[in-house]
């Protein structure tokens, strides 16, 4: 593995604070630690100055004016130097283990501009033991030393053996040496390259993300591909010259194109019209014959259509008559179905209402009972309330009376009187005149017992009354049922009538049960009756179609006869079909054969024309395809011999051209590289020194120098040695001769001259013998003589080459003609004449058409008979299964009988349906009708008498009770006793009054509550009665409506009615369908007859017009044929292949040619007048005159000295051969020069892919780089969308834009720019020229967009910008970008330097304290992995674990400022090692 070059040390001489200081640089990281002003930036500035000694770039910002609006004159360098000579040197060792010291001598220039003078130099071959400070300083004594100026340094080094000192006048040479020796990574050819390198170093020095670099990453990372641009420029220049030549050839071809165009268009114009007239004459004859045939056929068709029209009209009238009857039957059936459906719906409603009425009846009876009970309770409540009211009133009156009695003191007397009155009333009621107050209690018990007895008797009578009332209601119910069923009758007749109704109900139920079987039987018989009627209709229709009446017994025999006739007709029809198919097949085969022959005929005619042309061109007659192929092989052999000779002549011509070009080089150099090497070495070509040698001396000097005649004469060979190292771009043998080019002679050789030869003694043991060359080339005179002879030879070769090219071109055209003939016409050229075969096939086709017409007429009659027989068999097939129905005469009577029985059963069913419920209710209670409960009135009277007796007993008992209660009143005899009892009675009356009022209140409340309940019961009752009456009324209405409908509503009635309606609808639909068919057919027949009539008239008119036209055109055609034959142009005008084109195509062809001819002869007055006269369509012979005039005009313009032929067509062919040869030669040259757009796209795309892969490899080295929150750094390389679209179009869709790249007015760069503008119209191109834009588009770098991204914390990947990162993160990210750029430069420059060189890698970092320990460790790891050296500057607190650390402290001692430096290498277990190279205190190290 090649070791990477390293910077060993940095030496500062006479810098501010550093007199002679050498810093040994660590292989990885060198840290400069110190406070502000310690000299860290000065040390780094010295390094940068030695690396890039360009004063236009150097600018150390941290020491210039902060905030200045203009740049400092010092730019930071002048103030870092001391007066006198200063040095900054870099000691390096490269991959070849060569020690190289490069550096600069700096010196302040006096003046206010504060300028600095810089001189770069390099030292090679310096021993390792010599330190850089020893070279540039001279020790005066122990305490003093002197800095050597540059000239003394040069003398000192020249005195040292093996040491080379080089001073450079240009920075380019200085950097070129550094690149070649592996000190810098990139060859810096220009100021732009140096600026990029300085920006890189500056960015690394000050840290962070440099916007100057990130904005132009493409320039830093992507190499320029200038070779592609140069190749395109050369290509465009050659193409421009070639196109100019081709344009000149096209101008020359214009005359040839005009002649060819005139002949071609004139031939098309006249031949198309000539053949159109010939075709029209033949077509008119064919049309006349066709019109005559069609006229005869149309007359026959019209007669057949007339017969057909009469038959269909008769059948249509029959169907129209039958349709009215079917419509009436169908309407009646539909109405009947609607009535049945209505009756069924009415019946369903009746049944539903009857069920509702029964339910309402039950609810009504229940509600009547509830209302009766409520009324009784209401009466009791009213009586109780009335009694309570009376008692309250009585007590109040008693209390009022008592109060009054108190006032008059007569109360006792009143009570006594009342007691006496009560006793008298009891006596009166009880009829006890002896009743006293004392015996009243005994009589009270007697009358209470009597009251109890009367009450018991009344209750017994009440029970009997209830039972009698029930019997009376049952009798009334049964009587009402009988009245509802039978009508009004006497009550004594109810029993007999009820029994009769029950017996009749049983019979009616029995009949009603027979409704369904009778209905099914009737439906079956009606179906059979309808089938019988249909069979009778079919039989009548069949007899009508056959034109004869047939008996039922004759139908089977007739059926067999018709089947036999169908079989025979089917065989004949089948045979006729096969015969017709055979005829049609033969006709189709003939037609297909004729069509194929007509399609082949133009091809065969074209093949014959091509074959005749070939025979004329080669003078051979070809009778078979073998003759053609044999002649083609001979032609190929001749062509191959001519091509070989032409290529030999061409190769010799090219060799002569190359030799002329080589000899025409200035100075006689045959290799351009020699001129570049001579300029590089500072020498002169030997051929230039002897350029003036005479032609006679040229052979001697050429033999004298031999192979070294192309040597380079240099003043000093030792100075050329360094240029020869790694020199690859040179001839295999490069001769160098030391000498003065101004006074060079041939004394460098020891030579003996012989006869036409010399012997050169190169060394004591090496001689060279060289003869004089026959054609000397040494010297300008010899070269010019050789060039003259070569030019003469080139003229001969060019003439011979042109002759051979013409012959080859002619042979190739003949070969192409044969190839085209073989590829297109050989397969048909030697076949039989298709037109003769077409004529034979046409005659056979006419015979087939005549036979087919006769066969069609015969077959039509058989087909009609066959169809009639098939219709008869079809009708019989429908009639024969119904013969038994036709023979059944009693079917209608049986239907009537069953219908009558069904009517009786349906009447019984209606009776049962109407009165079934009443009979069912009457049957369990019919027995109550046997006796009429007339004693019910007597029982009612007894009950009323019992009630009166009970009331009388109650009154008597009450009167006795009152006497008993007033028994005390009888003792009131005086008023004193009466007054003494006033107080007690008053209180008792008041208590009874309160109790009576409370009782009255309760009675009123009970009366009101029960009254509300009674009202609700009455409302429910009224609602039920209303609903019952409404439904009863609706039921009666529905029954009346059902009776009014007059239709039997049973379960099968609807189905029967629907079947009947559907049958009639099917018959009506069939009749209408047949009628519509007949109407359409009749309309079509009438239209066909009208069309045939019009067609007959038109055919008659067309036939007579065509006959007249044929006769009229015959005279004009004869005149045209005479003119064609007289002028001998029939061969060119009678193009038989045009006979197969239509008239429109020929007319279009002629019109197009006419338009082209008007333009072609616009400048020729004679041809223009003849052409205008030929446009008359009524005078076709004038077109022939125009064609003859064109041929005569072209014959007069053929140059017989160049083209010896009288035929203009042949002359054009010869001219075309020569011009085609020249065009092909130049076109092939242009194709060699041109490059396709797809190739351009591929080159650019491959370059982009290569660079993307390279960037991807660079990204891999930065995957694990992390600074702070930045976890990784990467570089994104994307193709711009607009440019990607351009590449896609160039590679995939370039055919759509060939108008740009095939344009002769645009170069490739301009076409590319135009395409870019076409694809991106939104982009403003400004004032830039398309050529400039196109050249930019040829640079692949303009297609790419590059940006740096960092993976930072939770933000993920984002664009690397200083504002989005911390200071340390920005420094680390910027360092990663710079490392990537350096690595990219190395990869880019690897092919430019030696393979055994691996350049040095070194970057800077000032103010590294902004990085944390982890970031510092990452930098160390990055340096170790990439073998990169890093110089960082940091304050006191930086203490790296690896590398070398220098502690800088600036001190002032005796008015002298110097920097105290202490260095230590890493952290080792032992004590820090003092580094060598310190020239101050013993503890200091450098």
From Swiss-Prot:
In terms of superkingdom, the source organism counts as Bacteria
Query: Which Gene Ontology BP annotations are present?
Result: cell division; chromosome condensation; chromosome segregation; DNA replication
Q: Does the keyword Zinc-finger apply?
A: no
Q: Give the matching SUPFAM superfamilies.
A: P-loop containing nucleoside triphosphate hydrolases (SSF52540)
Q: Which UniProt keywords apply?
A: ATP-binding, Cell cycle, Cell division, Chromosome partition, Coiled coil, Cytoplasm, DNA condensation, DNA-binding, Nucleotide-binding
Residues that bind ATP: 34-41
- Which stretches of sequence are listed as region Flexible hinge? 666-783
- GO MF annotation list: ATP binding; DNA binding
Q: Which GO terms describe its cellular component?
A: cytoplasm; nucleoid
Where, per UniProt, does this protein localize? Cytoplasm, Nucleoid
Key word Methyltransferase present:
no
Please name the Gene3D superfamilies in this protein's record: 1.20.58.850, 3.40.1140.10, Immunoglobulin FC, subunit C (1.20.5.420), MukB, hinge domain (3.30.70.3500)
Main location per the UniProt record: cytoplasm
Q: Which Pfam families match?
A: MukB (PF04310), MukB_hinge (PF16330), SbcC_Walker_B (PF13558)
Q: Which InterPro entries does the record associate with it?
A: MukB, MukB/SMC, MukB_hinge, MukB_hinge_sf, MukB_N_dom, P-loop_NTPase
Q: Which family does it belong to?
A: Belongs to the SMC family. MukB subfamily.
**Subunit structure of this entry?**
Homodimerization via its hinge domain. Binds to DNA via its C-terminal region. Interacts, and probably forms a ternary complex, with MukE and MukF via its C-terminal region. The complex formation is stimulated by calcium or magnesium. Interacts with tubulin-related protein FtsZ.
Q: What's this chain's function?
A: Plays a central role in chromosome condensation, segregation and cell cycle progression. Functions as a homodimer, which is essential for chromosome partition. Involved in negative DNA supercoiling in vivo, and by this means organize and compact chromosomes. May achieve or facilitate chromosome segregation by condensation DNA from both sides of a centrally located replisome during cell division.
PANTHER family, per database record: CHROMOSOME PARTITION PROTEIN MUKB (PTHR42963), DUF4476 DOMAIN-CONTAINING PROTEIN (PTHR42963:SF1)
UniProt free text on domains: The hinge domain, which separates the large intramolecular coiled coil regions, allows the homodimerization, forming a V-shaped homodimer.
Q: This protein is called what?
A: Chromosome partition protein MukB
Organism in which the protein naturally occurs:
Escherichia coli O139:H28 (strain E24377A / ETEC)
| Record lineage | Bacteria, Pseudomonadati, Pseudomonadota, Gammaproteobacteria, Enterobacterales
Q: Give the gene that encodes this protein.
A: mukB
């Amino acid at each position: 593995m090649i070791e990477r070059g390293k910077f060993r040390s940095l030496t500062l001489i006479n810098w501010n604070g550093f007199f002679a200081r050498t810093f040994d640089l660590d292989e990885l990281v060198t840290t400069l630690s110190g406070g502000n002003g310690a000299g860290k930036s000065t040390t780094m500035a010295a390094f940068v100055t030695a690396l890039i000694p360009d004063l236009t770039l150097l600018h150390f910002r941290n020491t210039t004016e902060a905030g200045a609006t203009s740049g400092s004159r010092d730019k930071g360098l002048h103030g870092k130097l001391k007066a006198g000579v200063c040095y900054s040197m870099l000691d390096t060792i490269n991959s070849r283990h060569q020690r190289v010291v490069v550096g600069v001598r700096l010196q302040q220039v006096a003046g206010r501009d504060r300028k600095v003078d810089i001189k770069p130099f390099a030292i090679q071959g310096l021993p390792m033991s010599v330190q850089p400070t020893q070279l540039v300083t001279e020790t005066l004594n122990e305490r003093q030393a002197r800095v050597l100026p540059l000239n003394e340094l040069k003398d000192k080094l020249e005195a040292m053996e093996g040491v080379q000192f080089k001073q450079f006048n240009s920075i380019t040479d200085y950097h070129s040496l550094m690149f070649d020796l592996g000190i810098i990574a990139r060859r810096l050819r220009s100021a732009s390259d140096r600026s990029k390198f300085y920006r890189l170093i500056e960015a690394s020095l000050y840290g962070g993300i440099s916007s100057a670099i990130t904005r132009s990453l493409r320039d830093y990372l992507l190499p320029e591909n200038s070779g592609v641009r140069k190749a395109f420029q050369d290509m465009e220049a050659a193409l421009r010259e070639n196109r100019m030549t081709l344009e000149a050839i096209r101008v020359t071809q214009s005359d040839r194109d005009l002649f060819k165009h005139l002949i071609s268009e004139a031939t098309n114009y006249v031949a198309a019209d000539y053949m159109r007239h010939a075709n029209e004459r033949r077509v008119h004859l064919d049309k006349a014959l066709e019109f005559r045939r069609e006229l005869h056929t149309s007359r026959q068709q019209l007669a057949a259509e007339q017969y057909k029209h009469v038959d269909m009209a008769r059948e249509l009238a029959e169907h129209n008559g039958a349709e009215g009857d079917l419509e009436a039957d169908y309407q009646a059936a539909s109405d009947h179905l609607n009535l049945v459906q209505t009756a069924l719906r009415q019946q369903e409603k009746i049944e539903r209402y009857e069920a509702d009425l029964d339910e309402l009846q039950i609810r009504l009876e229940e509600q009547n009972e509830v209302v009766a009970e409520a009324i009784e309770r209401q009466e009791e409540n009213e009586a109780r309330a009335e009694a309570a009211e009376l008692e309250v009133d009585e007590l109040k009156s008693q209390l009022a009376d008592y109060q009054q009695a108190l006032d008059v003191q007569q109360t006792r007397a009143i009570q006594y009187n009342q007691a006496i009155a009560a006793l008298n009333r009891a006596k009166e009621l009880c009829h006890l005149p002896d009743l006293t107050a004392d015996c009243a209690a005994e009589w009270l018990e007697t009358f209470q017992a009597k009251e109890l007895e009367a009450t018991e008797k009344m209750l017994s009578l009440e029970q009997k009354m209830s039972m009698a009332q029930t019997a009376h209601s049952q009798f009334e119910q049964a009587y009402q049922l009988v009245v509802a069923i039978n009508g009004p009758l006497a009550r004594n007749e109810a029993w007999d009538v009820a029994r009769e109704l029950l017996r009749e109900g049983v019979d009616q139920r029995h009949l009603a049960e027979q409704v369904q079987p009778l209905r099914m039987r009737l439906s079956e018989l009606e179906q059979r009756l309808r089938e019988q009627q249909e069979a009778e209709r079919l039989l009548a229709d069949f007899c009508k179609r056959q034109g004869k009446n047939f008996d039922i017994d004759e139908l089977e025999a007739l059926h067999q006869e018709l089947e036999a006739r169908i079989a025979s007709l089917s065989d004949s029809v089948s045979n006729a079909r096969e015969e017709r198919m055979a005829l049609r097949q033969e006709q189709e085969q003939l037609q297909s054969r004729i069509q194929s022959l007509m399609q082949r005929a133009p091809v065969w005619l074209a093949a014959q024309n091509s074959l005749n042309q070939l025979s004329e061109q080669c003078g051979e007659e070809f009778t078979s395809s073998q003759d053609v192929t044999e002649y083609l092989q001979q032609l190929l052999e001749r062509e191959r011999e001519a091509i070989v000779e032409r290529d030999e002549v061409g190769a010799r011509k090219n060799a002569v051209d190359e030799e002329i070009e080589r000899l025409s080089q200035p100075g006689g150099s045959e290799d351009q590289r020699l001129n570049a090497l001579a300029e590089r070495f500072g020498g002169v070509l030997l051929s230039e020194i002897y350029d003036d040698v005479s032609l006679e001396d040229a052979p001697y000097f050429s033999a004298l120098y031999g192979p070294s005649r192309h040597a380079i004469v240099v003043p000093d060979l030792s100075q050329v040695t360094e240029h020869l190292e790694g020199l690859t771009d040179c001839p295999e043998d490069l001769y160098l001769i030391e000498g003065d080019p101004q006074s060079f002679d041939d004394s460098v050789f020891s030579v003996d001259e012989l006869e036409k030869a010399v012997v050169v003694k190169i060394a004591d043991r090496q001689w060279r013998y060289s003869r004089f060359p026959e054609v000397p080339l040494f010297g300008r005179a010899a070269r010019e003589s050789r060039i003259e002879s070569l030019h003469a030879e080139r003229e001969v070769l060019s003439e011979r080459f042109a002759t051979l090219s013409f012959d080859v071109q002619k042979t190739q055209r003949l070969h192409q003609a044969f190839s085209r003939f073989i590829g297109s016409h050989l397969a048909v050229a030697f076949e039989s004449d298709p037109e003769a075969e077409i004529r034979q096939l046409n005659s056979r086709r006419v015979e087939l058409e005549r036979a087919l017409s006769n066969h069609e007429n015969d077959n039509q009659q058989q087909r009609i008979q066959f169809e009639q027989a098939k219709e008869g068999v079809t009708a019989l097939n429908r009639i024969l299964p119904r013969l038994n129905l036709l023979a059944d005469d009693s079917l209608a009577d049986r239907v009537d009988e069953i219908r009558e029985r069904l009517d009786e059963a349906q009447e019984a069913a209606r009776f049962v349906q109407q009165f079934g419920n009443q009979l069912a209710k009457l049957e369990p209670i019919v027995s109550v009708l046997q006796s009429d409960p007339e004693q019910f009135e007597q029982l009612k009277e007894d009950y009323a008498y019992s009630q009166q007796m009970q009331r009388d007993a109650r009154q008597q008992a009450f009167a006795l009770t009152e006497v008993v209660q007033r028994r005390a009143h009888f003792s009131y005899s005086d008023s004193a006793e009466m007054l003494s009892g006033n107080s007690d009675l008053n209180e008792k009356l008041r208590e009874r009054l309160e109790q009576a009022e409370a009782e009255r209140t309760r009675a009123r409340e009970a009366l009101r509550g029960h009254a509300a309940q009674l009202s609700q019961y009455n409302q429910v009752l009224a609602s039920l009665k209303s609903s019952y009456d409404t439904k009863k009324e609706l039921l009666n209405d529905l029954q009346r409506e059902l009776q009014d409908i007059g239709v039997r509503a049973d379960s099968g009635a609807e189905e029967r009615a629907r079947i009947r309606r559907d049958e009639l609808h099917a018959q009506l639909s069939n009749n209408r369908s047949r009628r519509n068919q007949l109407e359409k057919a009749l309309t079509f027949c009438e239209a066909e007859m009208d069309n045939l009539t019009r067609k007959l008239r038109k055919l008659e008119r067309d036939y007579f017009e065509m006959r007249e036209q044929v006769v009229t055109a015959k005279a004009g055609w004869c005149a045209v044929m005479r003119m064609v034959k007289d002028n001998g142009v029939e061969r060119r005008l009678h193009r038989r292949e045009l006979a197969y084109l239509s008239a429109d195509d020929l007319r279009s062809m002629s019109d197009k040619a006419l338009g082209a001819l008007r333009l072609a002869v616009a400048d020729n007055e004679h041809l223009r007048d003849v052409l205008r006269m030929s446009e008359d369509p009524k005078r076709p012979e004038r077109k022939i005159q125009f064609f003859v005039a064109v041929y005569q005009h072209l014959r007069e313009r053929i140059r017989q000295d160049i083209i010896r032929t009288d035929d203009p067509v042949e002359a054009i062919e010869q001219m075309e051969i020569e011009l085609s040869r020249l065009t092909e030669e130049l076109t092939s040259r242009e194709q060699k020069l041109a490059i396709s757009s797809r190739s351009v796209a591929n080159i650019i795309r491959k370059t982009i892919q290569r660079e993307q892969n390279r960037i991807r490899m660079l990204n891999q080295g930065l995957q694990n780089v992390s600074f702070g929150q930045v976890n990784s750094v990467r570089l994104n390389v994307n193709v711009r969308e607009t440019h990607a679209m351009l590449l896609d179009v160039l590679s995939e869709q370039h055919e759509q834009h060939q108008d740009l790249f095939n344009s002769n007015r645009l170069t490739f760069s301009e076409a590319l720019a135009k395409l870019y503008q076409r694809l991106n119209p939104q982009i403003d191109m400004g004032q830039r020229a398309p050529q400039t834009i196109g050249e930019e588009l040829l640079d692949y770098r303009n297609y790419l967009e590059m940006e740096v991204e960092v993976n930072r914390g939770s933000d993920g990947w984002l664009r690397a910008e200083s504002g989005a990162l911390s200071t340390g993160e920005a420094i680390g990210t910027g360092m990663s970008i710079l490392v990537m750029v350096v690595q990219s430069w190395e990869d880019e420059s690897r092919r430019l330097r030696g393979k055994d060189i691996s350049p040095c890698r070194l970057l800077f970092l000032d103010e590294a304290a902004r990085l944390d320990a982890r970031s510092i460790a990452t930098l160390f790891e990055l340096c170790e992995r990439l073998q990169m050296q890093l110089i960082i500057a940091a304050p006191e607190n930086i203490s790296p674990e690896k590398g070398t650390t220098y502690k800088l402290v600036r001190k002032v001692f005796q008015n002298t400022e110097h920097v105290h430096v202490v260095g230590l290498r890493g952290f080792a277990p032992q004590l820090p090692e003092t580094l060598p190279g310190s020239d101050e205190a013993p503890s200091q190290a450098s």
